[in-house]
Amino acid sequence: MKVTAAFASLLLTAFAAPAPEPVLVSRSAGINYVQNYNGNLGDFTYDESTGTFSMYWEDGVSSDFVVGLGWTTGSSKSITYSAQYSASSSSSYLAVYGWVNSPQAEYYIVEDYGDYNPCSSATSLGTVYSDGSTYQVCTDTRTNAPSITGTSTFTQYFSVRESTRTSGTVTIANHFNFWAQHGFGNSNFNYQVMAVEAWNGAGSASVTISS
């Protein structure tokens, strides 16, 4: 639910991006999980029945938030989405986001981001090519940090798209298989969502998921 260790302190302050429109994310096929970590820091609305959500945030946010819709149990299936995302002056991600239970890991497939690339301050694992672009791949270790089990120490995995986009198909298996060469469990999944995260600035996003 947070970024790299080097920026952990930022996550305790504010989260936002430039602010025109609300964030709408939709995936009508089997949506059964609402990710709402500090969604009260902005204007977060959702409708599970249609697979849509919106998030709008302004300057002055006091902490990190992660909001989105998805599934209680993740998988390597592909996700197709389209989005409107405005976060150029915010530390923010538009990403496939989830957790693995054991070995515990937090993961992001970052399709677009604001003013902060998480791989700029993490350990590089190289690159992987998927869905028409190279992705930078990196990892970090969070120590005594908030997690799905309370406070724990766990590994983060990031794939950050070099040719950023706000629509397309994410072939999740390509990332999971690459990460698995570097300790990623690739099984025993916890939840998985299409998410928006931010911790400063102001912004908005709208996403429709169809897979």
From Swiss-Prot:
Quote the Gene3D superfamilies the UniProt record gives. Answer: 2.60.120.180
Q: In which pathway does it act?
A: Glycan degradation; xylan degradation
Q: Which domain of life is it from?
A: Eukaryota
Cite a single GO BP annotation.
Answer: xylan catabolic process
Q: Where in the cell is it found?
A: Secreted
Does the entry feature the keyword Translocase, yes or no?
A: no
Primary localization class, coarse: secreted
Q: What is its EC number?
A: 3.2.1.8
Query: What is this protein for, i.e. what is its function?
Result: Endo-1,4-beta-xylanase involved in the hydrolysis of xylan, a major structural heterogeneous polysaccharide found in plant biomass representing the second most abundant polysaccharide in the biosphere, after cellulose.
Family, per entry: Belongs to the glycosyl hydrolase 11 (cellulase G) family.
- Indicate what this protein is called per its UniProt record: Probable endo-1,4-beta-xylanase 5
Q: Tell me the classification of the organism that encodes this protein.
A: Eukaryota, Fungi, Dikarya, Ascomycota, Pezizomycotina
